[in-house]
Amino acid sequence: MSYLRPAVVLLILLTLITGIAYPLLTTGLAKLMFSQQANGSLVMLGDEVVGSSLIGQNFTQLGYFSGRPSATAEMPYNSMASGGSNLAISNPELDKAITERVKSLRQANPTQTGPVPVDLVTASASGLDPQISLAAAYYQAPRIASIRQMPLSEVKQLIDSNVQKATPNFFGESVVNVLNLNMALDAQSHVKVPATSTKS
């Protein structure tokens, strides 16, 4: 029994350190040094929380930029069920889903005759990606310009002003956050569109 007492003491000590002290310390430091990130990188519009810059939303109105398809369970961009579709590239269901998405995008963007950007028809591994590529944003620009009655050049400038560059530049590609872009679009456009997005 002589070995039992130190084992119990060590268990209690490590539990207090790793289970209570360490989490409290790291959480406190995070809130002190990175307050916005520690609280979920919430995006505010006035006094209202409209989303998070880390989680995408399901924008369905044609007057808004849309993000990547979401494969999360129950509803799009469900942060409680993060995950991809897990469909192999050879799976007929994936091919069918992509074909339907391409058809829908071509109907919504009739002036675009080139290839549809791949991130507009494929879900990410998490199913929650809040960003799209610049190619995906530019692809939707003519539709947005038409519905919002804005010059196409102004819409493209709006995209350019919301670019998030990869850090460092050679690591990944530049992207644009869809929620931030749509908020900037609302602020600049005189034609208002009812926002119908599914928030997580």
From Swiss-Prot:
Recorded GO MF terms: ATP binding; P-type potassium transmembrane transporter activity
Primary location: membrane
Membrane topology annotation: Single-pass membrane protein
Disulfide bond residue pairs: none
Gene Ontology cellular component list: plasma membrane
Signal peptide segment: none
Residue ranges of coiled coil: none
InterPro entries: KdpC
Keywords noted in UniProt: ATP-binding, Cell inner membrane, Cell membrane, Ion transport, Membrane, Nucleotide-binding, Potassium, Potassium transport, Transmembrane, Transmembrane helix, Transport
Superkingdom of origin: Bacteria
Entry's transmembrane regions: 6-26
Compartments where located: Cell inner membrane
Subunit: The system is composed of three essential subunits: KdpA, KdpB and KdpC.
The protein's role, per its UniProt record: Part of the high-affinity ATP-driven potassium transport (or Kdp) system, which catalyzes the hydrolysis of ATP coupled with the electrogenic transport of potassium into the cytoplasm. This subunit acts as a catalytic chaperone that increases the ATP-binding affinity of the ATP-hydrolyzing subunit KdpB by the formation of a transient KdpB/KdpC/ATP ternary complex.
NCBIfam families named in the record: kdpC, PRK00315.1
UniProt record similarity statement: Belongs to the KdpC family.
UniProt protein name: Potassium-transporting ATPase KdpC subunit
Top-level taxonomy: Bacteria, Pseudomonadati, Pseudomonadota, Gammaproteobacteria, Enterobacterales
Gene name per UniProt: kdpC
